[in-house]
C-alpha cells in the first residue's frame, strides 16, 4: 500500500497571521518560503523545502492590491514547477469579486479574469469565504469550496443575548445573507436599497424593514 501524500501549508505575506493560526489548529508547521524583492519592484517566490508529491495549501488573500494576487500566482507557479501533487489556493478574501458581471457596456469582469489567472497558473482547488456573488463559483472549472462565516458568527451573536437586535445589510446583494441571519436569530431585518450615480458615491438610499416573523 502506498504512503498517503503529506499536506503542507504555506502563506503569502498578506495572510501570514491566519496561516499561523491554521497551522496551530492542525498541529503542523508553517512551510518555509522565501519572497525576494528586486529594486524595480518585482519579486520572486521560492520554496525553501521540498514539496514534491505533497498536497500544498497556499493561504493568501488577493486584496487590497494587485501585488497580493501576483504573489499568489507566483506561489502557485513555483509549487507546480516543484512537482507538488496538488495545489489548493486558500483565499479568505477574494479580491475583484465585485466585478462579477457586465452591468454596463465596455466594462471588465475582474472576477472572471482572476478565476482564469488562477486556473491557468495551476491550482487544483479553491477554498474561499463569503464571495461577493455566489455565481463567481461558476467562473472556475475546478472544485470550489465556498465557506460561510455565519457558521461562526451566528452562534456567537446569539450567545451575546443582545436586546433590540436588528440585522441590516447595506445593499440588495446582501439581502439573502442578512435574511439568513435574521431568521436564525429571530430578529428584524433592515435592507438598504442604494442608488449610485458613480462608483463609491451613493445618490439616494431607501430603507426597507421586516419583522422577525416575516418570510
Regions flagged by a language model, labelled:
Residues 2-17, 24-172, 179-183, 189-190, ...:
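Active-site loop-to-helix "anion-binding N-cap" substructures in soluble metabolic enzymes
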Amino acid at each position: 500500500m502506498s504512503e498517503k501524500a503529506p499536506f503542507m501549508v504555506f502563506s503569502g505575506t498578506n495572510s501570514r497571521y491566519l496561516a499561523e493560526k491554521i497551522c496551530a489548529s492542525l498541529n503542523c508547521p508553517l512551510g518555509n518560503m522565501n519572497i525576494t524583492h528586486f529594486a524595480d519592484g518585482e519579486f520572486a517566490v521560492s520554496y525553501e523545502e521540498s514539496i514534491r508529491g505533497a498536497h500544498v495549501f497556499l493561504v493568501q488573500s488577493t486584496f487590497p492590491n494587485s501585488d497580493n494576487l501576483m504573489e499568489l500566482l507566483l506561489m502557485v507557479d513555483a509549487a507546480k514547477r516543484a512537482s507538488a501533487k496538488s495545489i489548493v489556493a486558500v483565499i479568505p478574501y477574494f479580491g475583484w469579486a465585485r466585478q462579477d458581471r457586465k452591468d454596463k457596456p465596455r466594462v471588465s469582469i475582474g472576477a472572471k479574469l482572476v478565476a482564469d489567472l488562477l486556473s491557468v497558473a495551476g491550482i487544483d482547488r479553491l477554498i474561499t469565504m463569503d464571495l461577493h456573488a455566489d455565481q463567481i463559483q461558476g467562473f472556475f472549472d475546478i472544485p470550489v469550496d465556498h465557506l460561510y462565516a455565519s457558521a461562526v458568527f451566528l452562534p456567537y451573536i446569539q450567545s451575546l443575548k443582545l436586546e433590540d437586535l436588528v440585522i441590516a445589510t447595506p445593499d440588495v446583494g446582501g439581502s439573502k445573507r442578512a435574511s439568513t441571519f435574521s431568521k436564525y436569530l429571530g430578529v428584524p431585518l433592515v435592507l438598504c436599497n442604494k442608488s449610485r450615480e458613480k462608483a463609491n458615491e451613493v445618490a439616494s438610499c431607501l430603507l426597507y424593514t421586516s419583522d422577525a416573523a416575516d418570510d
